[in-house]
C-alpha cells in the first residue's frame, strides 16, 4: 500500500510534513484524500499544490455557478482571471535527511528487458527538466511564430514537444506561459499555442467536474 510505504519513508527520514502536487483525476484525488486523512491521523502535516495547471478547476464557473461544458466561454473566463505566479529559480541546494531510507538500486528491480524497446524514445526525448527547458527554448525561438500552420505538418518539427514533460511534471504550465509572454510574440495571449494550453486546462476542468467522462461521453447523445 502506497500510504504505508509513504509513512515508512517519512518515519525513516524523520520527516514531519508531506508535500505534493495535486491531481484532479477522480481516482487519484480519491486516493490522495484517503492518504491525507491517514497521514494527519498519524501526526504528519500535509499540504498539496496546484502545480500542473494554470488555474484550479474549482475556481472557474459560469454566472450560474456551474462548471463549463463548452471550451470558448471557459477559456475566455480563464483569461480574465489568469495571473499565474512567476516561476521560482532553481534551488541552489536541497536539505538532505540525516538518515537515508532503505532503498534499492534501479538495476536490482530488473526492469530492463533483453530487447531494448526504449531506443526510439531515447532518440526522440530527453527526459527531465533539462530536456524540457531545451524543448521550450527551441520552440519559442524557432517554431512559435509559425505554430498555427506548421503544427499540422508531419514533416516539420512545428510543435513544442512539451507534452510528456508537462505530463510528468518536468516543466510547469506557468513556466511555459511566461516563456511565451517573454518571447516577443504579438498578441501572444490569443495565439494558437496558448489556446492549446487552454484545452489542456479544459480537459482537467471536465475531468474534475464530470468524472464519468473517463469512460463515457460528456453528453449522452454523443
Regions found by a protein language model. Give the residues of each.
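Glycine/tryptophan-enriched, flexible segments
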Residues: 65-221
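Trp/Phe/Arg-rich N-terminal binding region typifying the photolyase-homology
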Residues: 1-85, 189
Amino acid at each position: 500500500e502506497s500510504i504505508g510505504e509513504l509513512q515508512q519513508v517519512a518515519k525513516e527520514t524523520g520527516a514531519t510534513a508531506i508535500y505534493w502536487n495535486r491531481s484532479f483525476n477522480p481516482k487519484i484525488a480519491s486516493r490522495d484524500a484517503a492518504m491525507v486523512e491517514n497521514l494527519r491521523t498519524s501526526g504528519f502535516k500535509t499540504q498539496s499544490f496546484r502545480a500542473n495547471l494554470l488555474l484550479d478547476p474549482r475556481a472557474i464557473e459560469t454566472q450560474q455557478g456551474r462548471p463549463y461544458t463548452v471550451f470558448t466561454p471557459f477559456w475566455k473566463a480563464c483569461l480574465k482571471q489568469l495571473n499565474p505566479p512567476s516561476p521560482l529559480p532553481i534551488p541552489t541546494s536541497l536539505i538532505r535527511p540525516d538518515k537515508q531510507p532503505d532503498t534499492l538500486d534501479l538495476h536490482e528491480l530488473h526492469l530492463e528487458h533483453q530487447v531494448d524497446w526504449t531506443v526510439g524514445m531515447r532518440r526522440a526525448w530527453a527526459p527531465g527538466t533539462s530536456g524540457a527547458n531545451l524543448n521550450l527554448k527551441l520552440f519559442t525561438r524557432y517554431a512559435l511564430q509559425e505554430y498555427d500552420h506548421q503544427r499540422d505538418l508531419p514533416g516539420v518539427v512545428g510543435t513544442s514537444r512539451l507534452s510528456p514533460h508537462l505530463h510528468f511534471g518536468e516543466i510547469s504550465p506557468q513556466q511555459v506561459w511566461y516563456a511565451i509572454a517573454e518571447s516577443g510574440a504579438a498578441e501572444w495571449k490569443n495565439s494558437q499555442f496558448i489556446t492549446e494550453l487552454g484545452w489542456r486546462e479544459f480537459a482537467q476542468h471536465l475531468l474534475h467536474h464530470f468524472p464519468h467522462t473517463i469512460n463515457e461521453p460528456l453528453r449522452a447523445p454523443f
